[in-house]
Design a protein with these regions (language model features):
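Active-site microenvironment for binding and transforming phosphate-containing groups
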Residues: 1-285
Length: 285
């Protein structure tokens, strides 16, 4: 079953944008987590219409209103919004109550050089932004900790998935065996062709990850020197390598490139487009 379920059937409007809600008991028991679509919101083309990121050339006031609409729909106070200035790294920030609002109104106030966020504070809404890259979600249902990570190919081969797990263990006392994880909508292997330069970094992991899963991490394409890369599966294998049980990982089948009617896609939209947001937060009582 697809873990990210659209709220489209409940009616999507400018004021009530489309959300893809992460389902499952662990993700619904006082935890809000999911992924935004591109429908709804107020941004104009080519960012139409639910763009959540400032770093594209969208009007800042439209982005801010879209963020307000998301918080309103989720029931989170905008003052609890937190995001990072993503740089395709494996850098992670542990978010406290004092960090509330970082990145809400501008890029300068966000966590700089950061692609992973973790918190155990109710009312904090962790967010990160995408247009083909892979959103990673983590929850420790025992210690009530949530985390998000942004994984492009650079962050993936830098093992941001493993770094998230190790940081949760080190900073929050989590145990990998307790963790649940999800991999959200992103570009699928059949649409993500990379060159030998990228595969040199991927191949460093290949031998170490053998036997983790039954789905190949990548397969050769017909073009010389090119490979179709499955970033979702590679991140899944990295999670397993770091200690998460395979049955505790859910993987979305949504491909942002194939369904760029529903999602922003950097490759399908020619590079000039908006960004979806992943989110995760512990709800206040």
């Amino acid at each position: 079953m697809e873990p990210f379920q659209s709220n489209w059937q409940t009616g999507v409007t400018e004021q009530r944008p489309e959300l893809f809600l992460l389902s499952g008991k662990e993700w619904s028991d006082g935890i809000s987590a999911g992924f935004t679509g591109r429908r709804g919101g107020i941004s104009k083309a080519p960012y139409d219409s639910f763009n959540l990121a400032y770093h594209v050339e969208d009007q800042p006031e439209d982005v801010l209103e879209n963020r307000r609409l998301l918080c309103q729909q989720l029931g989170f106070d905008p003052k609890g919004w937190v995001c990072g200035e993503q740089v395709h790294s494996n850098h992670i920030a542990c978010v406290t109550a004092e960090d509330s609002g970082k990145g809400w109104a501008d890029r300068a106030s966000a966590f700089q050089d950061t692609d992973g966020l973790i918190t155990n504070v109710p009312g904090i809404l962790l967010t990160s932004f995408y247009a083909d890259c892979v959103p990673l979600y983590f929850i420790d249902p025992v210690r009530r900790v949530v985390g998000l990570a942004h994984a492009g190919w650079k962050g993936t081969v830098a093992d941001i998935a493993g770094e998230m797990i190790r940081t949760m263990e080190r900073q929050y006392g989590s145990q990998a065996a307790d963790l649940r994880a999800a991999i959200g909508p992103s570009i699928g292997m059949g649409q993500y062709e990379v060159d030998e330069r990228v595969m040199e970094h991927v191949d460093v992991w290949t031998g170490r990850l053998e036997g983790n899963g039954q789905v190949p991490t990548y397969a050769k394409s017909g073009a010389p020197g090119k490979t179709w890369l499955d970033l979702k599966q590679l991140n899944r294998e990295l999670m397993i390598f770091a200690g998460i049980q395979p049955q505790h990982i859910e993987v979305s089948q949504w491909c942002t490139h194939e369904r760029h009617d529903l999602f922003f896609s950097y490759r399908a939209d020619g590079g000039r487009t908006g960004r979806m947001a992943s989110w995760a937060g512990i709800e206040t009582e």
